Design a protein with these regions (language model features):
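Bacterial N-terminal signal peptides
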Residues: 11-20
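Bacterial N-terminal signal peptides that target proteins for export
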Residues: 2-12
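A beta-strand edge to alpha-helix "cap/lid" segment located at domain peripheries
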Residues: 23-157
Length: 157
């Protein structure tokens, strides 16, 4: 009888250990009332607005090992973004148009978004520039940060 209880207990533990990773990687879309999704969207908004003004968001927003791909296909790092954040700005009317957060477990999210700015293209100072992007967020040490970003310039609506 005791052996049967031990086997039942061992089976329950094994099943739990197998199911926990499956549960942890379930995906879900962030809802309007999700506190973490709201935080992520707000930080994305600040980064989009940071094209126009130095709002100091980059230092905490991007992970130290961040890698991005620009609209021209060039790679950039957190150090590149910090330098860019301190440079002279020509853009105005910067803003976030859309951001949708898709969570994968409790520590990873992918954000699909779009933004705009006027005057970002120095060769056309009055032209509106629009881009869509995908940012990958990771929660490490209790903090959410962007670890990767890919930008793509698109025709403005």
């Amino acid at each position: 009888m005791r052996v049967m209880h031990i086997r039942t207990f061992a089976s329950a533990i094994a099943a739990t250990l197998l199911l926990v990773p499956a549960y942890a990687h379930q995906s879900r879309w962030g809802s309007a009332d999700d506190k973490t999704a709201k935080y992520i969207v707000e930080m994305e908004r600040k980064w989009a607005e940071g094209v126009c003004v130095d709002n100091g968001v980059v230092a905490n927003l991007l992970a130290d090992d961040f890698q991005g791909t620009s609209t021209q296909g060039a790679r950039f790092t957190k150090a590149d973004e910090l330098k860019d954040e301190k440079s002279v700005r020509t853009a105005h009317d910067c803003g976030l148009d859309e951001a949708k957060v898709h969570f994968f477990g409790n520590s990873m999210a992918v954000v699909y978004g779009s933004e705009h700015a006027v005057g970002k293209d120095k060769s056309q100072p009055n032209a509106k520039v629009c881009q869509v992007w995908t940012d990958t967020w990771l929660k490490r040490g209790g903090s959410w940060q962007i670890i990767a970003s890919h930008d793509n310039r698109v025709k403005c609506p």
